[in-house]
Structures are given as structure tokens and as C-alpha cells.
């Protein structure tokens, strides 16, 4: 599905979509390939998702949207304020929660963490709260910069404790150089499963001897 603004040439765009579907039908069975349209009310779609993001627990960690006040439904040992903005990472996805639980299990004060695909910075922030001395996050999306910065401020994490690099750690030699090999006690990667295949042999290069690689894949389906 997709949205079109009123100013766009809807007839031309829809005609192009129909032509593309007809071409695709020559190679595979995609069903009737019909195109339907409807009008929708004008909303702030960039922020509409906030209606569905409310506080939740990951074991004894309470994660609260930054625009809400926490409600103690049960005791917690960590409070995390989060606003992912347009970056990935509310913490609600099961794979993110699996990584959070592994961080709780393995983090010791004074450790260092490399978080590949940091998004909103949620895994790095959990690490900071658990006693990680230094987090380096990497991400392809420039939106991660403002998201991480705002979430650091909301959780009183000093700038020197969590740094961020925008770029591809798999292919970008400059990002690889900035990260530095064998520098981290932990590497986390909670990203699309098909990215983990080329990433994993690269990610382990940044671990200290005996370090731990925590990963959880998200299917792009």
C-alpha cells in the first residue's frame, strides 16, 4: 500500500503501477493484481504511530515513551525513556527484547559495547544503564543521530558515554577504522536477518578476545 498527496498526479502514478503489475504477471502468478484507491483523512502520519506506543516492561525494565509519565504497574529496577522518532527501535519488537535480556545477563560494569544498527539507541542505552563505560553505535540512517541524542538526554547519559557513527561498518573503511578492531567486550546487532549474514564475520573482528556477540535477526517479510 502507499499514500499519495493531493498535489500529485494520481492518475499517472496509478497507470504506471498497473502497467508494472501487468509486466510482472508475465513472469509469476501474483493473483488478480487489482489496484484500488480510497481517500484518507489528513493526519500527521509521522507521529500517528505514537497512539499505539505505550509503556511496557521487559522483565524488570520499564520502557516509557518520552511523552508519557511512567505508571508503576509493578516494581522495576530500570526506567528507560524512549522516543525513536523516525529511527528503528521502540523496544516492543521481540528481537529487541531478546537482546535486552542478553545484555542484562552478560553486562558487567566497565565493559565496552559496539551496537551495529543502533537506530534509536535502545540497546546502547540499556547497556549504559547497566554500567557499560562506552558505547559506539553505528547506523545507516541519518535519522538515528537526532533519535540517539534526544534519548541520551532523556535518560541522562553523557555524550562521552555513547558515541554514534553514520555509515556501513561492513563496507566503509572509514567507519571500520573509527570503530577499531578488538576494542569491545560486547557487540550487538538487532537488524534484518539478511544483513546479519555479511555482518557477522565483520562484527566479530571488533570483539576483544573472549568477547560476546549478541544478535537477533528480523525477517524482512
Regions found by a protein language model. Give the residues of each.
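Hydrophobic residues in well-ordered beta-strands that form the structural core
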Residues: 64-65, 137, 215
